[in-house]
Amino acid sequence: MLSVPHLDREFDYLVSAEQSDDAQPGVRVRVRFHGRLVDGFVLERRNDTEHFGKLGWLDRVVSAQPVLTAEVRRLVDAVVARYAGTRPDVLRLAVPTRHARVERETLAIPVSPLPLIPGPVDPSGWEVYGRGGQFLTALAESRAARAVWQALPGEQWADRFAEAAAQAIRAGRAALAIVPDQRDLDVLWRAVTTRVDERSVVALSAGLGQAVRYQRWLKVLRGSARLVIGTRSAVFAPVNDLGLVMVWSDADDMLAEPRAPYPHAREVAMLRAYQARCAALIGGYTRTAEAHALVRSGWAHDVVAARSVVRARAPRVVALDDSGYAEESDPAARTARLPSIALRAARSALAAGAPVLVQVPRRGYVPSLACGRCRTLARCRHCTGPLSLLDRATPGTVCCWCGRADLTLRCARCGSEVVRAVVVGARRTAEELGRAFAGMPVITSVGDTIVPEVGARPALVVATPGAEPRAPGGYGAALLLDTWALLGRQDLRAAEEALWRWMTAAALVRARGDGGVVMVVAEASIPTVQSLMRWDPASHAEAELAARTEVGLPPSVHIAAVDGTTGAVNELLQEARLPDEADLLGPVDLPQGVRRPAGTPLGAPISRLLVRVPREQGWQLAASLRRGIGVLSVRQTHQLVRVQIDPLHIG
């Protein structure tokens, strides 16, 4: 596979008689190209060629085991066309690195007969939702039903996924489920192995070692797996006779691939469902604008519960104005940065013997500081990154970007040496709550030290978004702090992501009938807060989609972000031959916090140009950019550019 874009095409080679039996479509081979050996795949065998020059010989067949199936190859081609990528880049995502010993050992073992078909599926869990029972019936009949599922608060989503997979397997088909991270994968594994024979289930994730991952992947390839579950790259798994593709929590940015061509697992899964003509399911506690667009277009059905059921299952949500807690008469409220009504709710839950969840947006102690006099943000003198406090005992500040310490902080604007906290992190919050609730255990769960589960006993659990532990029986209360840090970001998905973070935490709280309450420290008039209070993410997604359509933002349009030096971006535009309706936005400086494109000159200013086209011209946009990149790739002096189609964060 050649890494240069202009050589992303098929090449013809001669196959010797000794290699003929092994050199079948899909096998790995080594070929000589311009004097060096490169890896490749056999795509097809033909008796003729359209090449007019002299053909070279295949150097060797690396393995006689075909690893690139026809279905995966079609999916790879579709992803390349959708995201303006190259086949080598997508194939690296789709086909894992070979492990010779594992391959020899695996191929020496005969393929075992498939385990018994799962028993009948109890439909009661799905019948709570409108069209839920119909979706299971469609799976039993091997119909290509497509649905966007709105999970109820407190719902055991993994059980519903397991039931859907078991139904597809009972119909003689296979199923594929994609989740954001290892925690979700572990939860799903426990659920599916209670309904489907463990011998026919394979879990794939990036955390596996090369040998284990390749061994499991070969099991899928050989048809020994009826159900494959995994993280984002598992969406390319070579599942035989695929009948159902499922994606959980597509709002999670872990489903977006950080490597070129940056595909999103939701989009790849839907492409695969379309190509395979199989059923598809997108589920979550909230709903993205992209998932809702599938419903509004009629491509997918809406699977939601009646409002009466939602109200009965959801906790009571109370919005509290955060402007006045500093003046509260309760000293504990001032200490914990909480209105006294929120503290009373926490105390009531603790007194009832239930844990209390406290969600804070940032980890660390004080991750952001500002001048105490003029409120100018404190920034590093070396890289302009934000300065933070590590803990109470450590003197001075530390840069969050470069890690340099600054022992003598002085405001660059007014010269003051007084600082104030802009954002308070999880550890500082835990410290403050420990003082406000003397004698109460305080558990901290953050990105680097996640606690998977807490006991059903009184405790304060401070967690960052995505690190909330599960609690048997649910939390008695949840407090959502510093909500402005999520809502106030200048980002296309700020409101959508804030609601997802809040609902993911609130879904862990008991129903209102059992005393569950969620206190969100935010203005009740904010539309996103209102959606949380009503527990109505579908209407929020509808409003979000309408707003984006009005101003021309994805998913109502397709946008390509082109990053590189000004000269490189201009060269690409000249060669790309963009669609006539393409709208150019920018260029502007590369957004703060976005990494530079690989291979760009150090110190050179990097700009970002946005190219916007109507939704029906997305494939044309990708094709034109891919063609332009190929033309530039031929030139020895060209500078690299990075192209991302519909990136999560535009700028």
UniProtKB/Swiss-Prot annotation:
Residues that coordinate or bind Zn(2+) 2: C380, C383, C399, C402
Keyword Nucleus: no
InterPro entries: P-loop_NTPase, PriA, PriA_3primeBD, PriA_3primeBD_sf, PriA_helicase
Listed Pfam families: PriA_3primeBD
The protein's assembly and partners: Component of the replication restart primosome.
Described function: Initiates the restart of stalled replication forks, which reloads the replicative helicase on sites other than the origin of replication. Recognizes and binds to abandoned replication forks and remodels them to uncover a helicase loading site. Promotes assembly of the primosome at these replication forks.
Protein name: Probable replication restart protein PriA
Gene: priA
